[in-house]
Amino acid sequence: MIKIGKDLSKFSVKSEKPSTKDELTSIIENRMRKYGNECDMNDIDISLITDMTHLFFGSEFNGNISKWDTSHVTDMSYMFAWSSFNRDISEWDVSNVNSMNCMFTHAEFNQPIGDWDVKNVRNMSWMFSESKFNQDISRWKTGRFANLVNMFFDCPIKEVYKMK
């Protein structure tokens, strides 16, 4: 069965390369209107984007962005807060991210991200607060000055999965 309007790989779509968060936001909104909340957006080249704050805040987007090149992103604060997003982003390069403040707060997200390199993240406060997250991140190593205030507030994560 073919899902028309969901998987963009079935269509000839010109890859887009936004240079600002506003351009990226516009592309995402247009794609969601045209193809729905579960559309594949892996063809969007986000390699110039450094700020992803509030990108999917309160959104019902739950499409594929697993192959995005996030290696230049420095801020992911509130990126998926209050959103329905719950897809694989385990391969993202987050090694240059400084802030993940409230990134998944109140979100549906519950996918493995235990292999992320978070050593440069300085702010993880409220990151998973009141979210569905319950995955193993015990191998994460943060800098000694990282803000972890209420990172797991009212989150169902098991103690053994938390950072050591």
Spans of features found by a protein language model:
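Negatively charged
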Residues: 1-164
